[in-house]
UniProtKB/Swiss-Prot annotation:
Keywords: Repeat, TPR repeat. It holds the Pfam family TPR_1. SMART domains: TPR (SM00028). Coiled coil: none annotated. InterPro entries: TPR-like_helical_dom_sf, TPR_rpt. This is Tetratricopeptide repeat protein 13. TPR repeats lie at residues 143-176, 216-248, 249-282, 284-316, 317-350, 352-384, 386-418. It comes from the Eukaryota.
Amino acid sequence: MAPAGCCCCCCFWGGAVAAAGAARRVLLLLLLGVLSAGLRPGALATEHYSPLSLLKQELQHRQQQEAPAGGGGCSPQSGDWGDQYSAECGESSFLNFHDSDCEPKGSSPCDSLLSLNTEKILSQAKSIAEQKRFPFATDNDSTNEELAIAYVLIGSGLYDEAIRHFSTMLQEEPDLVSAIYGRGIAYGKKGLHDIKNAELALFELSRVITLEPDRPEVFEQRAEILSPLGRINEAVNDLTKAIQLQPSARLYRHRGTLYFISEDYATAHEDFQQSLELNKNQPIAMLYKGLTFFHRGLLKEAIESFKEALKQKVDFIDAYKSLGQAYRELGNFEAATESFQKALLLNQNHVQTLQLRGMMLYHHGSLQEALKNFKRCLQLEPYNEVCQYMKGLSHVAMGQFYEGIKAQTKVMLNDPLPGQKASPEYLKVKYLREYSRYLHAHLDTPLTEYNIDVDLPGSFKDHWAKNLPFLIEDYEEQPGLQPHIKDVLHQNFESYKPEVQELICVADRLGSLMQYETPGFLPNKRIHRAMGLAALEVMQAVQRTWTNSKVRMNGKTRLMQWRDMFDIAVKWRRIADPDQPVLWLDQMPARSLSRGFNNHINLIRGQVINMRYLEYFEKILHFIKDRILVYHGANNPKGLLEVREALEKVHKVEDLLPIMKQFNTKTKDGFTVNTKVPSLKDQGKEYDGFTITITGDKVGNILFSVETQTTEERTQLYHAEIDALYKDLTAKGKVLILSSEFGEADAVCNLILSLVYYFYNLMPLSRGSSVIAYSVIVGALMASGKEVAGKIPKGKLVDFEAMTAPGSEAFSKVAKSWMNLKSISPSYKTLPSVSETFPTLRSMIEVLNTDSSPRCLKKL
């Protein structure tokens, strides 16, 4: 592979002119890099890998595209590799030309492409032969010259000619190891996409191993052929043998890469660490090490490794990109933005950085800025499915349905090939298109006159919520876009009346109080505004209810119920991000309800730790221990003391498995523990909470998860509890309106928190339950005269606080400890009605789109 800025040369052999593709293959770098099977082991695939992306699929995709081809090239990317590994050249004493036809990296390209004639090839071959700078050189000068010619042919891209040359030599000397080896390389270079080439390459390399079993470079070369074919375990075995014969930094790095592909991040980390101990100046190995941390959820350790890689190579684009993504996962928007920007300053056309930055901006609520990144991404890569999907989503979220649906249709037309797995974007896009059409048709219909949960077909909702392929029998598509319904236009903040501007600023502030300060949760200003407006609308609706006013829902006027209160927040959460199906699970088809919906969260999967929930691992561990002791107290009282002593030594969830297997033969490969939720309505009665599952055969290969199964029967029990609490809340709220007694306000506060405690444990929505419920808490408390002034503490998740609390009183106590409740400002009473100010979908999208930052900052 040639350094960036290197020119490439044509060559003649036997009167035949190499094709234009061969003309771009550089003799020097191919002999240094591609012939590394014997000249510098490992370069064929190891040095040809692009740096590992943050997503394993990206790594595998690139490996499949690049490694099988094996050809050199003068791309800037391959140049990066040559530069990154310059520190490793001392690992091998193999061929190192100095009389190259290439300019050094960074200089201008050659003025013209030179042709290598027969004389020059022979001259190069003679030089190689004299110094025996090729694999398995012999003691015969004439034989060495013939072998060197064949290797130069490989370097010139003339693989068939090289194979014929080696074959002629093998007819005379069947066990000539260098010829067998070279022919294997040539077959591999022809392209592993042709399985025949792969089989012949492996056959030849296996012959070499039989004849020369103690040469590590041959095992590595065979691993380089095996890995692109998906035969990872065999490749790892070959690299292990090579390491046993002659350890090197490159070999450990190469094997670590394969462990990474296999998702064995801990073992991959060990190999990258070993590689760095042998040669510390390896920015790519340091990047890989950081990625093993990243994929295990160890974000701070990953960031340190990425920074170290940048110390070694200041212009390392992939390290900046990875650093940006790690900061994004931590929720540090400013640091992530800075890192992505540095990557793009080095290469403004770096597609994956544009894609990742665009997605971060979308989830930060900066849709216009996100859209610019996706458009630029598509200019560079027109068939980039992620950027195309996100472009369509961004347009739809801003109310630009024509452009949005056009982009969605492009994704829909990109059908996967037979046997190819459909991308997540392809699976989601038809749901988004149908939902987009529905939203467009209702842009100007009063929100009180229609209901998404009723209008959308049951099977559509069921499949969408479960992220299933769009295979719905007898589905009738939503009507196409109606020309008379125009897209949403941009609304300047200054165009709103002063009192509406004040309403928006208050909403922004309230919404920011709902932000989780936990890894994995990026601040989203669009969600903040939406849920702040939801809280204010809940406040106003609850106050009207407590003064005996009725509400208009679905075209009917009636007294507000608890679901109406939550529906206010649901509508705002839905429109803030139309990508996510926020649907009531009890409104699903009867068949789906009977089976139940599982709200599943992996806390540990294999070696991957979900950092969002790390704060709760110890709490869940203590709960599991208590349940185990209760179980053994009832079923194995004699062995209870032994079990207790064993459990006292357990400090990590994953260490529970061997203990359970030791004391319970029924455990086999896992066990489950169920939580219970005590009833307030019926003292002594308990409802099913969530299920904790731990499965696996050893530490490092476990699944630690929690799930809530929302069945029809369970839903009815929780609804009865919430109905009773809401009835009590309404009665006490009406008393509170007429009274200023502190005790009444405190009782109302406890009822609000208790009601939401059961909502959290029920998990009645397909998405968004957490922020929806918290906005209801904030809004209902304001209706009672109390304002939430405190932020949610770092590491705390309100839904998990409710789910892991022993009862509603405990949840109320912990929630009030951080809410810092104070008397509501009188100015809230003068705010305009949210439902009347934003009565349609169009007006809701307009207010979410508008930029209030300069004015609202002044008001605060």
